[in-house]
Amino acid sequence: MKEYKPQEIESKWQGVWSEKKVFETPQYSDKKKYYALVMFPYPSGTLHVGHVKNYVIGDIVARYKRMQGYNVLHPFGYDAFGLPAENAAIAHKIHPKKWTLDNINVIRGQIKKIGISYDWNREVITCTEDYYKWTQWVFLKLYEAGLAYKKPGAVNWCPSCQTVLANEQVKDGKCERCGTTVTMKYLEQWYFKITDYAEKLLEGLDRLPGWPEHVKTMQRNWIGKSTGAEVDFPVDGMDRKIRIFTTRPDTIYGVTFMAIAPESPLVMELVTEDKKKEVEEFLAKVALEDRFKRTSVEAKKEGVFLGRYAINPLTNEKIPIYVANYILYEYGTGAIMAVPAHDQRDYDFAKTYNLPIKQVIKPKDGEWNINERPYEEEGIMINSGPFDGLESSKGIEEVTKYIEEKGFGKKSVQYKLRDWLISRQRYWGAPIPIVYCEKCGIVPVPEKDLPVRLPENVEFLPTGQSPLTLSEEFKHTTCPKCGGPAHREVETMDTFVDSSWYFLRYVNPKLDDKPFESDDVNYWLPVDQYIGGVEHAVLHLLYSRFITKVLHDLGYLKFDEPFENLFTQGMIYKDGWKMSKSKGNVVSPDDMINKYGADTLRMYILFMAPPEKDAEWNDAGIDGVNRFIKRLWNNYYKILDIINSNDTKNENEFGKEEKNLRRKLHAMIKKIKEDIEGGFKFNTAIAGLMEFNNQLSDYLENTKSPNKKLLREIAEKVVLILSPFAPHMAEEMWHDLGKETLIVEEKWPEYDPEALKEDELTIVVQVNGKVRGKITVPADASEEEIKNRAVENAGKFLEGKTIVNTIYVKGKLVNIVIK
């Protein structure tokens, strides 16, 4: 019998696929298109099996769809700009470009060894000029549309990485890259106006039934739509108003102080001379605190009175104005009307500073002791002048209407979403295509002059300013408008800009006069199946949706959502932890391939758990899958020996065992298709293969003269089903079956409904609901015949009793009711 030698087989068939260009996708085809895409990786080093899971899931989908007759686009690339390359370059004294490209070469080799069916002709690398030229083009299109702008403001600053971070890149007050506590800094920065698309981004989520609900919820929460009112509170003794936003205008009669964020310019504008020193000391103290922790419900509430009062426009009461540590400058207007009776944080602050607590909402049923804790729910308005007795929902409406009529404010919709900060003070990123001219001001680089090349001979140690500042050659240029002296923008773009459109570039990766051909992109997009980690739910997915919508509105795309269906895979853990070099728990795919072969690795990754769930790597588990693969291989070659033997007995006749085994074969084919199409249940699909292999083993061991016709059908069907999961051994088996085609180009097998029909049925016999026996009847037996057989079978339990009713549940049981 032929021995299973995975490394030989895998190398052989990978060579054949490459030589015959099997996975190169034609741009157009009579076939229906299918775009299968996995999130491209950051090339930070070698892959571990946790990364491989993503690619194997994508490969099953691509291979399955190809076998179903689709024209499949299945590309790959690298998100190659970013801080880790720069930090590694600093640590190892190697240029980021070399470090990145060396890593890419290693990763590419690893992926090819796993047998992933990528069209390598479409590979994109975001740090190459032919890619970032078009990232710069995206920037210019947003700039022309008024969606890219520069403004000064407070930004998140990582002292270790020496760069600005978007809000989304701050986790619990720390840099998500290095874990350093984030501080505040005032800088002029470039932004994309994603807030203009807040409503479109929300609305689009309702048109994505193929996305997991939890991902859509995360995006909705991040966008954070709130409906309420903006209200102006005049400052007593000044020609100045403080505008606040509130979702609860029904509580306005309960305002007892105003609170302003420490970062707001209003603080120093309003503070009186006698309070200035105390306020400045407070601001200095708060600047050292974690902004995200200080604004949490649990954090200690602190502030300083500014020495001024505001006037409540509805009551004309004077209320003190404080700077308070629990107010975030970025949310709403950076100032709030504080209603301690109905907000926990305001309540805590009021208790600390002995401020009044005035109840203006009571529960619909019963009373509430406001001295014990605030009442934060909706209810009935009290102590609210003409609005007393109104339910909160009606009160919100009426108070808003009143302030609009009186000119105190207006109805307003606010979003938690802030504009996307894209400037980075680092080297390894796409240069921003802008020049500054003393005469013309800010001037965009013309499209014909792209790319603005990233110079290679640059000192990139972090100093707090962009390393490009130190490159005289890069910095000095001429103004595209007037031809006079000018200097380039020295900051680079956030790498999320690179990844916000890469799925478009795969369609025309080698096009040099435009980023993509509109007709081609509109044929292939949106992506039919996108696969990646849930950690990208907010950042990458939100930004990609935004850029797609902008390009749609500018007329470049006919679609406005990039990803039709989204699947988020679970992580692979080892020893209870996410795999990482620092924890020493990394499992290398190379080691597994050298020991077991790529097909075993693929099968184990898919078998260990439902693909959307996290799973624990287990060496005994991969051993078990390897044993199954060898048993399947041995059964297959036993079948080939039988088929190729001179024994002509039993060629056409199917006995009971043959019919039963064929039924199980077609039941497996049916189930595996349902498993793949019904939520990527690859683990249960493989379990189905294992179960059938056991049934096949029993047949081969216990049948003296196995049926060749049936075995030939089994050999063909099983290897076709195996093909997406273990493609190398499937190719070898297919070839040894005498086939001249490649199995990757074959059709997925369909089950035969006739084969699923039972010749006989086993019917459970019950008496008054208790099982009393079983009967075997012909599958075409009538109901009357089955009932009669059941009564006969249960004879001894019916003696001396009267049959009241006989109930037949088709194909399952007969229940005889007696008394």
Curated annotation (Swiss-Prot):
Motif 'KMSKS' region: chain residues: 578-582
UniProt keyword annotations, A-Z: Aminoacyl-tRNA synthetase, ATP-binding, Cytoplasm, Ligase, Nucleotide-binding, Protein biosynthesis
Chemical reaction(s) catalysed: tRNA(Leu) + L-leucine + ATP = L-leucyl-tRNA(Leu) + AMP + diphosphate
Protein EC: 6.1.1.4
Short sequence motif named 'HIGH' region, residue ranges: 41-51
Annotated localization: Cytoplasm
GO cellular component terms given for this protein: cytosol
InterPro entries: aa-tRNA-synth_I_CS (IPR001412), aa-tRNA-synth_Ia (IPR002300), Leu-tRNA-ligase (IPR002302), Leu_tRNA-synth_edit (IPR025709), M/V/L/I-tRNA-synth_anticd-bd (IPR013155), Methionyl/Leucyl_tRNA_Synth (IPR015413), Rossmann-like_a/b/a_fold (IPR014729), tRNAsynth_Ia_anticodon-bd (IPR009080)
Top-rank taxon: Bacteria
Binding site for ATP: K581
Pfam families membership: Anticodon_1, tRNA-synt_1, tRNA-synt_1_2, tRNA-synt_1g
Principal location: cytoplasm
Record family assignment: Belongs to the class-I aminoacyl-tRNA synthetase family.
Protein name according to UniProt: Leucine--tRNA ligase
Species annotation: Fervidobacterium nodosum (strain ATCC 35602 / DSM 5306 / Rt17-B1)
